[in-house]
Each structure stands twice: as structure tokens, then as C-alpha cells.
């Protein structure tokens, strides 16, 4: 038997992050249990039959379909996001692929923003077309480009905002209105903003996807993804077919790790932003850096939109460009003593990477340039260290 405290509609984000989705077993444990099992037993053959044909009460039948610990994570994240439903996946890319695949089919059409993470770009430019889906990428900040692309029918619109790694901010409400007129579902990758800062459903999104590997875990421990939505019919008739039969299921242990990560998400995001804001201003003063891209800076091209769309804050990621190109970027990375070189992000530890040669290495050079990625660009995921230590590390590396 499990016991549960029902979530209140008045609970705020921090409370939902800690209390949402808690279901205790008969042992009444304080910390949620990890149900490390693949299958479940039945009292009779008739009960097993009823569990599979849908005539019996809802229950767990196989952890590829659903698992108690995974279900707790899904419920907590849905409460925090303000969504009716959530399905967890093995990784963020699994979430992106399954969400888009459930929106379209051979002969369909998907429109996306041009500035995308390398694997997302590959899905839209290579994988979907392989299955007969027409795709088109547009400048996400150009309203006229969206109007033109969505002047004809589409199945889905996919966008990252802020984008990885260029931190472009896209007007979700504007795109959603156009997309719905074109018959498309709007799928928003909300990884960089997190559910703490940005609420895509309130702006017209139909589906929100996450790499839970990033801020939701926040400590580089595990992989995970999530698909959030309100349309149960879409789930039952489309999404669940992919999730059930292709097996992108989340490990119960990873679900438990992510469930506990959610408990401190709002605290960590606040700290990331404090450090990132101060560090962005500091980097703007360094002569070796030709450009600092941070939504919280007034110099950001979409600063006003970012402040409106992201709860008045800029997030925990910074992009910067060094005048000396790749050589200067590599020199900075190689001389860092505190900040790690890593392609992950959203970690308690500050991490830096060179997108041209890592996350977007397999993207053709001309496409990288079109996205706004240069050989001198670095992406900095600002962690939770003391801000003065971060400043000193970057200053020393810049001045070798």
C-alpha cells in the first residue's frame, strides 16, 4: 500500500519540486523508494489478461511501459512544468526524437529553428527526411521567415530557446500562433531556461522536451529525458506507440536520481544565474573577448524578449567569442585551472566547451556559420563555485 499527499494547486515552484509526486510504500519511507524491477506478478492468469487487455484496474505490468519510481519523477516534473502529463525517456535526444516522430509521418512536414544542438539538427536535416518527412529550418529570430515557412501546412514546429550554443531567444507565443494556424504542434526544447524560468505552455507550446541530464540532475550523474504535454489523445494514439514499442525507457535508478535533483532545482538555478550574470559582466570587460552573448545583458539582440519570456533573468549559460579564433579559444580552455573542459552543461561544476569542434563538429562548416557558431566561440555553463574563483580562473587563462 502506498500513501500520498495530494499536491495543492496553490503550491509554488519550490514546493512542487520537493513534494510533487511523492508516493510512499507501506514502509512510509521519507525519501522516495527505488523500484529496481523489470516486471510485476499477478495473483491469477485472469488478472494478467485483464492487465493487458485494459479491462482491469490500472497497474504496472512491465517497466518498459511504466515503473513506480519513474512515475513519481514524471508526476513531479509535470507539476513543476504546469503540464497535465509527462513521459520520461532514457535521454534528452530520445525525448526529442520520440516527440517529433509522434507528431508527423511520411509525407509530413516539420519546421524548425536553424540554431539547434548538433544532434537535434541531425534529426531534422537527416533522420526525418530519411523517413519521408519534409523539413525546413529558418532563422528563429526572424518573424518574416516564420511567417513564410508557416504559410503552408506543417505537422510540427521544433525550437530551442535559448538555443544551443548561440543563446538566441525565440518568441514562443508568436511562433505558436502561426504554427497552430498551419495545423502544427509546437515542440519546445526548454533545457537552457529550465521550468524555473520559462513556461512554454503558457506561451502556446503543445509539447515541451528536456534533457533531464542537464539542470534537472545538475551534478553530472545520469542521463534522462522528458516529454511533457496536455493532449492525452495525442499521447494515447501516437506518442505511446513509440514509447511502448521502441523501448526508450528510463532506468528506475536514473529516475530516482532525477527525482531528488528536482528537489534542489530552484535553489541551484538561482545560484547559476547569480554567478552567470556577474561573470557575463566581468567577461564583457576583457579585451581578449570580442563578444559576450548572455540573454541577461542589455547588449543581447533579444534581451527584451528574454526578460519577458524568462521571468526577468538570463539563465546559467554564456557564449563568448575570442578575437583570435580557434587558437585563442583552445588556449583559454587549456589554461583553465578550475573550470573543466566538458560538453555537458547545467552542472554544479562550471564547464566550458568549443562547439565548433565538439557539440557541432559533424555539422557542415557553412551550416555552423549560418547558425552563428564561429571557430572562436566558447560555451560556458556557469556552475556553483565562488564567483571570485571563477573570475580569477578566467582572467588568468585569458592573460597567459
Describe each region flagged by the PLM.
Residues 80, 283-287, 336:
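Acidic-histidine catalytic/liganding microenvironments
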Residues 57-59, 222-224, 262, 313-317, ...:
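Short, solvent-exposed beta-strand edge segments and adjacent coil->beta transition regions
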Residues 44-97, 119-126:
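Conserved N-terminal alpha-helix of the aminotransferase class I/II PLP-enzyme fold
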Residues 2-8, 14-23, 86-288, 293:
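Conserved PLP-enzyme active-site core in the AAT-like
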Residues 2, 125, 134-136, 147-148, ...:
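PLP-dependent enzyme catalytic core of the Aspartate aminotransferase-like
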Residues 22, 36-42, 192, 214, ...:
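Glycine-rich beta-alpha junction loops
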Residues 289-378, 382:
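Conserved C-terminal alpha-helix-loop-beta "cap" of PLP-dependent enzymes
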Residues 2-67, 75:
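N-terminal "arm"/small-domain region of PLP-dependent enzymes with the aminotransferase-like
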Amino acid at each position: 500500500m502506498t500513501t500520498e499527499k495530494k499536491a495543492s494547486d496553490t503550491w509554488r515552484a519550490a514546493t512542487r519540486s520537493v513534494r510533487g509526486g511523492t508516493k510512499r510504500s507501506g514502509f512510509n519511507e521519507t525519501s522516495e523508494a527505488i523500484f529496481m524491477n523489470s516486471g510485476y506478478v499477478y495473483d491469477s492468469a485472469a488478472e494478467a489478461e485483464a492487465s493487458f487487455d485494459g479491462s482491469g484496474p490500472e497497474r504496472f505490468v512491465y517497466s518498459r511501459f511504466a515503473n513506480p519510481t519513474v512515475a513519481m519523477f514524471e508526476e513531479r516534473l509535470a507539476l513543476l512544468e504546469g503540464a497535465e502529463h509527462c513521459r520520461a525517456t532514457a535521454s534528452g535526444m530520445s525525448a526529442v526524437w520520440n516527440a517529433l516522430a509522434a507528431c508527423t509521418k511520411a509525407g509530413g512536414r516539420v519546421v524548425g529553428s536553424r540554431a539547434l544542438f548538433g544532434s537535434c539538427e541531425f534529426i531534422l536535416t537527416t533522420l526525418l527526411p530519411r523517413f519521408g518527412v519534409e523539413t525546413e529550418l529558418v532563422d528563429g529570430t526572424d518573424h518574416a521567415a516564420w511567417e513564410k515557412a508557416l504559410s503552408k501546412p506543417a505537422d510540427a514546429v521544433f525550437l530551442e530557446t535559448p538555443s544551443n550554443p548561440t543563446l538566441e531567444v525565440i518568441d514562443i507565443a508568436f511562433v505558436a500562433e502561426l504554427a497552430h494556424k498551419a495545423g502544427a504542434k509546437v515542440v519546445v526544447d526548454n533545457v537552457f531556461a529550465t521550468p524555473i524560468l520559462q513556461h512554454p505552455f503558457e506561451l502556446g507550446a503543445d509539447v515541451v522536451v528536456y534533457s533531464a541530464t542537464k539542470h534537472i540532475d545538475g551534478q553530472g550523474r545520469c542521463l534522462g529525458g522528458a516529454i511533457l504535454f496536455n493532449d492525452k489523445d495525442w499521447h494515447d494514439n501516437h506518442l505511446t506507440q513509440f514509447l511502448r514499442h521502441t523501448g526508450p525507457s528510463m532506468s528506475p535508478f536514473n529516475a530516482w536520481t532525477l527525482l531528488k535533483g528536482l528537489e534542489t532545482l530552484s535553489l541551484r538555478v538561482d545560484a547559476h544565474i547569480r554567478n552567470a550574470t556577474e561573470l557575463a559582466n566581468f567577461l564583457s570587460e576583457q579585451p581578449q573577448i570580442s563578444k559576450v552573448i548572455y540573454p541577461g545583458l542589455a547588449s543581447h539582440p533579444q534581451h527584451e524578449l528574454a526578460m519577458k519570456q524568462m521571468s526577468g533573468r538570463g539563465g546559467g549559460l554564456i557564449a563568448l567569442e575570442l578575437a583570435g579564433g580557434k587558437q585563442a579559444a583552445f588556449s583559454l580552455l587549456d589554461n583553465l585551472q578550475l573550470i573543466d573542459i566538458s560538453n555537458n552543461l547545467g552542472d554544479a561544476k562550471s564547464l566550458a566547451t568549443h562547439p565548433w569542434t565538439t557539440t557541432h563538429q559533424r555539422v557542415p562548416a557553412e551550416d555552423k556559420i549560418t547558425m552563428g557558431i564561429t571557430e572562436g566561440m566558447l560555451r560556458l555553463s556557469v556552475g556553483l563555485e565562488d564567483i571570485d574563483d571563477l573570475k580569477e580562473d578566467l582572467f588568468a587563462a585569458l592573460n597567459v
